[in-house]
Swiss-Prot record:
Keyword Lipid biosynthesis (UniProt): no
Protein name: Chaperone protein DnaJ
One BP annotation, GO: protein refolding
Record text about domains: The J domain is necessary and sufficient to stimulate DnaK ATPase activity. Zinc center 1 plays an important role in the autonomous, DnaK-independent chaperone activity of DnaJ. Zinc center 2 is essential for interaction with DnaK and for DnaJ activity.
Binding note for cofactor: Binds 2 Zn(2+) ions per monomer.
GO cellular component: cytoplasm
UniProt zinc finger (CR-type) residues: 135-213
Binding sites annotated in the UniProt record for Zn(2+) 1: 148, 151, 201, 204
Key word Nucleotide-binding present: no
Principal location: cytoplasm
Length: 375
């Protein structure tokens, strides 16, 4: 079994990329894994052979040597240190089964359609809270698998095309004798597609796609929040053999702000005020993300932790009308350094205190005295 060509064992073409080789290996390993075929020596031999093949082809240096010299490149020198290690790549039979279960349960006896939708892509974009407030248009750069300009996605060299696979006669499946059983499997020549390219495109090597560098403009609407997902339809990877392109998803990450915290569409901020303003009342001016200065009235006797609200001064509602609220939490600041005059005035104030000025503190100490003395 191991005398077969490694590419044939893995049912891939010699031009297959690493992802294609890995996918095919996992599919075959799931099919022939000893846990799934107890007591089947043929399946065990097949499993060892595909593991040997994958251990070689997954390593760029080993693959290059194999492509040039075949197995002779590894004779007499200890080889690769023992084949069969590829099985550890997936951890166990259950992992293989989970990764390729969908493919295994696919229809039998029919060629797998060569038309496939392109993969979706993800791009993570960081913006500031100010940018989330106002919205903006940003340019992003990505590398994406796009339709090959040379063959226009056909995978075939100009002047040539696809033809029906002579091995499976277009069915995409072949039957293989294994011991007393005949099993059906994907055609190793056309990889289950039912068609082959006789003269591959030299630019994309028959894939029909090439990686391209693209610059895209992304419109960030006002009001986006951390975790908002924006879809750019058709900007993902190009489809295979005429299939539709995937989508590009922009995931928004809003960096923390030094002053404001966001909760839904409301903006919160801690605002310190002097103890005299807290006692006597007054007003403060609070800047917002829209550049406006909002005047907030401070009632006399306000305490630390009290929240004051300015309606309609928060974040814009995404794809809607109106805005959230601006909510400020008052932090009364006690002076740490006093002039002689200020200390004198505060001493005079203390001499005139009756306890009614701060009912909570006087009530607390009265209650504590009652608890401790019983009076």
């Amino acid at each position: 079994m191991s005398e077969l060509d490694y590419y044939s064992l893995l049912e891939v073409e010699r031009t297959a990329d690493d992802k294609t080789i890995k996918t095919s290996y996992r599919r075959l390993a799931m099919r022939y894994h000893p846990d799934r075929n107890p007591g089947d020596s043929d399946a065990e031999e097949r499993f060892k052979a595909i593991s040997e093949a994958y251990d070689c082809l997954k390593d760029p240096q080993k693959r290059a040597a194999y492509d040039r010299y075949g197995k002779d490149a590894f004779q007499g020198g200890g080889g690769f240190g023992g084949f069969g290690g590829g099985a550890q790549d997936f951890g166990g039979f259950s992992d293989i089964f989970e990764s390729v279960f969908g493919e295994f349960m696919g229809g039998r006896g029919q060629a797998r359609s060569s038309v496939q939708r392109g993969a979706d892509l993800r791009y993570d974009l960081k913006i500031s809270l100010e940018e989330a407030f106002k919205g903006k248009t940003v340019d992003i750069e990505i590398d994406v698998a796009s339709v090959c300009d040379a063959c226009h996605g056909s995978g075939a060299k100009a002047g040539s095309g696809r033809k029906t696979c002579d091995t499976c006669h277009g069915s995409g499946r072949i039957r293989v004798q294994q011991g007393f059983f005949v099993v059906e499997q994907s055609c190793p020549v056309c990889q289950g597609k039912g068609e082959v390219i006789s003269d591959p495109c030299p630019e994309c090597h028959g894939e029909g796609r090439c990686e391209k560098h693209k610059t895209l403009s992304v419109n960030i609407p006002a009001g986006v929040d951390d975790g908002t997902r924006i879809r750019l339809s058709g900007e993902g990877e190009a489809g295979v053999h005429g299939g539709p392109a995937g989508d590009l998803y922009i995931f928004i990450h809003v960096t923390p702000h030094q002053v404001f915290q966001r909760e839904s569409y409301n903006l919160f901020a801690h605002v310190p005020i002097s103890f005299t303003k807290a006692a006597l009342g007054g007003s403060i001016h609070v800047p917002s993300l829209d550049g406006e200065q909002y005047e907030i009235s401070i009632p006399a006797g306000i305490q630390s932790g009290k929240q004051l609200k300015r309606r309609g001064a928060g974040m814009p509602v995404l794809n809607g009308r109106g805005r959230g609220d601006l909510i400020i939490q008052i932090d009364v600041e006690t002076p740490t350094r006093l002039t002689a005059k200020q200390r004198e005035l505060l001493e005079q104030f203390r001499e005139t205190e009756t306890g009614e000025e701060c009912p909570k503190s006087s009530g607390f100490f009265s209650k504590l005295k009652t608890i401790l003395t019983g009076e």
